[in-house]
């Protein structure tokens, strides 16, 4: 069973937005502050704990269960490893590409962990979820009320904002039945024009907050190459302080809301307002035109 005092959070966001990197760096900072944390990777790539463990997890719940014949044949210590600052790390895994439902791994893993006492003596459980998929098995942490606080990693790019709005729509669907709430948007900067202002505007429209603006810094890539979090690789760096600031905000966050997703027309109008998209009249003129024709 799960302790009712544990805060169960989940990080969602467009594929490639830096969600796993942002979540691991933030959770590392939270662990530095004395928080007891478990990460449940909900991505078939099984890379949600790589920076914590200095390596990709050698096995996953679903892979080992397939080898043994049943998840009941597993031992907790075989799939739960200890990483940086004592963070517990589990990867749910998934089937081979094109075979079966990857979301099944999430359901199987969480049930196994709950039944085997993995949730004892924890302050936070964090689910790191694949891309912007909010249907079926990948929505399971939301749908079943496992994750109570959702943090959406986004940026000032159109598709990242589009994904954030879609995820907000998924949260709204289960907000009343499961009690899930949106904790805020994390802007993982891509250095687009007026990016912080744009994401704050989007957050307001979604009835939430931009909980933190994470600036772009090459030190993140340097740490990743060494399979380390920034806080471990360069603890005194400015970027490390940014992740600590975000960690404190999540620990102290009491602004948990039911989101108000917006229509595509409103999102496009917002992008036009900030110069990401051309206005409709100009847009209509360039649709379907090759580069030479628009010079």
UniProtKB/Swiss-Prot annotation:
Enzyme class label: oxidoreductase
Gene3D superfamilies, sorted: P-loop containing nucleotide triphosphate hydrolases (3.40.50.300)
Disulfide bonds: none
Membrane-spanning segments: none
Record note on modification: The reversible ADP-ribosylation of Arg-104 inactivates the nitrogenase reductase and regulates nitrogenase activity.
Keywords noted in UniProt: 4Fe-4S, ADP-ribosylation, ATP-binding, Iron, Iron-sulfur, Metal-binding, Nitrogen fixation, Nucleotide-binding, Oxidoreductase
Residues in coiled coil: none
Presence of the UniProt keyword Metal-binding in the record: yes
Chain positions with ADP-ribosylarginine modification: 104
One GO molecular-function entry: ATP binding
Amino-acid positions noted as binding ATP in the UniProt annotation, renumbered to this chain: 13-20
Metal-binding in keyword set: yes
Cofactor(s) listed: [4Fe-4S] cluster
Catalytically driven reaction(s): N2 + 8 reduced [2Fe-2S]-[ferredoxin] + 16 ATP + 16 H2O = H2 + 8 oxidized [2Fe-2S]-[ferredoxin] + 2 NH4(+) + 16 ADP + 16 phosphate + 6 H(+)
This enzyme's EC code(s): 1.18.6.1
One Pfam family it belongs to: Fer4_NifH
GO biological process, one term: nitrogen fixation
Subunit structure: Homodimer.
Alphabetized HAMAP family for the sequence: NifH
Family named by the database record: Belongs to the NifH/BchL/ChlL family.
Job description of the protein: The key enzymatic reactions in nitrogen fixation are catalyzed by the nitrogenase complex, which has 2 components: the iron protein and the molybdenum-iron protein.
Protein name from the UniProt record: Nitrogenase iron protein
Organism: Nostoc sp. (strain PCC 6720) (Anabaenopsis circularis)
Gene symbol of the encoding locus: nifH
């Amino acid at each position: 069973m799960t302790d009712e005092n544990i805060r169960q959070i989940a990080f969602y966001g467009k594929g490639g937005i830096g969600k796993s990197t942002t979540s691991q760096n933030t959770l590392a900072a939270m662990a530095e502050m004395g928080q007891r944390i478990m990460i449940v990777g909900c991505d078939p790539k099984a890379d949600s704990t790589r920076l914590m463990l200095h390596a990709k997890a050698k096995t996953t719940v679903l892979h080992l269960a397939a080898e043994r014949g049943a998840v009941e044949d597993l031992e907790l210590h075989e799939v739960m490893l200890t990483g940086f600052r004592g963070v517990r790390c589990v990867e749910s895994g998934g089937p081979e590409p094109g075979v079966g439902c990857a979301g099944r791994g999430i359901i199987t893993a969480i049930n196994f962990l709950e039944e085997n006492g993995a949730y004892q003596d924890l302050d936070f459980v964090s689910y790191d979820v694949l891309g912007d998929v909010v249907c079926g098995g990948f929505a399971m942490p939301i749908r079943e009320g496992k994750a109570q606080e959702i943090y959406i990693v986004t940026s000032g790019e159109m598709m990242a904002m589009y994904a954030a709005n879609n995820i907000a729509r998924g949260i709204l669907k289960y907000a009343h039945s499961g009690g899930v709430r949106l904790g805020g948007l994390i802007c993982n900067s891509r250095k687009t024009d007026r990016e912080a202002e744009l994401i704050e505007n989007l957050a307001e429209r979604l009835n939430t907050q931009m909980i933190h603006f994470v600036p772009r810094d090459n030190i993140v890539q340097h740490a990743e190459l060494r399979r380390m979090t920034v806080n471990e690789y360069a603890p005194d760096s400015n970027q490390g302080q940014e992740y600590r600031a975000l960690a404190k905000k999540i620990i102290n966050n009491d602004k948990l809301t039911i989101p108000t997703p917006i229509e595509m027309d409103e999102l496009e109008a917002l992008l036009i307002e900030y110069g990401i998209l051309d206005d409709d009249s100009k847009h209509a003129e360039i649709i379907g035109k090759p580069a030479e024709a628009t010079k």
